[in-house]
Amino acid sequence: MELTPREKDKLLLFTAALLAERRKARGLKLNYPEAVALISAAILEGARDGRSVAELMSLGGEVLTRDEVMDGVAEMIPEVQVEATFPDGVKLVTVHEPVR
């Protein structure tokens, strides 16, 4: 299977998000990479589902709460930026203070 660097990045992100999702389901608090991966994957999947940039900016802030991440992680993530593919092209989605 031949993958472009962008496709490899998306696959790695998805894998990290899947791990984070499983840990969250077990009641574990997520660390920085897990939190960013889970938020980013939610944005990418939302774009794939046909949601708008505005909807995804809102959705990104609903993925995790402060109670679901380790102490200090929320402050380490002032924003998450993801280049997502929409039907009309690639757009940058920015979520400010995603862990609320």
UniProtKB/Swiss-Prot annotation:
Subunit structure and binding partners: Heterotrimer of UreA (gamma), UreB (beta) and UreC (alpha) subunits. Three heterotrimers associate to form the active enzyme.
InterPro entries linked to this entry: Urease_gamma (IPR012010), Urease_gamma/gamma-beta_su (IPR002026), Urease_gamma_sf (IPR036463), Urease_subunit (IPR050069)
Name listed for the protein in its UniProt record: Urease subunit gamma
Domain of life: Bacteria
Gene Ontology cellular component annotations, sorted alphabetically: cytoplasm
Reactions performed catalytically: urea + 2 H2O + H(+) = hydrogencarbonate + 2 NH4(+)
Compartments reported by the entry: Cytoplasm
Biological process per Gene Ontology, one example term: urea catabolic process
Keyword Cytoplasm applies: yes
UniProt cross-references to Gene3D superfamilies, sorted A to Z: Urease, gamma-like subunit
Ion transport listed as a keyword: no
Top-tier EC class: hydrolase
Family: Belongs to the urease gamma subunit family.
Naturally occurring in which organism (per UniProt): Thioalkalivibrio sulfidiphilus (strain HL-EbGR7)
This protein's UniProt keywords: Cytoplasm, Hydrolase
Pathway: Nitrogen metabolism; urea degradation; CO(2) and NH(3) from urea (urease route): step 1/1
EC numbers for this chain: 3.5.1.5
GO molecular function, one term: urease activity
